[in-house]
Amino acid sequence: MKFALIADEVRVSIDSDSDIVAARQKGRELAAQCGFPSTDLAVVATAISELARNIVRYAVRGEIILRLIDDNGRRGVEVVATDDGPGIPDVTLAMQDGYSTSGSLGLGLPGVRRLMDEFEISSDFGKGTTVTARKWKR
């Protein structure tokens, strides 16, 4: 699906905890520019944190790309998390609550899917993962 880009995209390289905080803040700022209410600002920031944390935990480094988008007058925020890490061997399993290969609670990806309005994931084992999530302004 192709959307009109409202503003220049923001790219945040992710390889440490401080980058997670930076991506979260940039995403919150973009969502605020779009006019999201404070509850949705928190939702977008939380989703970005989860995706960035997964990059640090599993892929070591990657990137969060943030965009303000427009779909025939419907405005929103698009978050793309991409990495060249090991990939996810079983995406279906990874999308189940409680599944984790690192001993975490296993709520990250399923949580992002629930928080955002649209969610797509593609992963090539041994090559990396890309997650795209969108939140639309109500």
Predicted region positions:
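Conserved beta-strand-loop-beta-strand hairpin that lines the nucleotide-binding pocket
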Residues: M1-R11, A52-R138
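Bergerat-fold GHKL ATPase/HATPase_c domain
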Residues: M1-T46
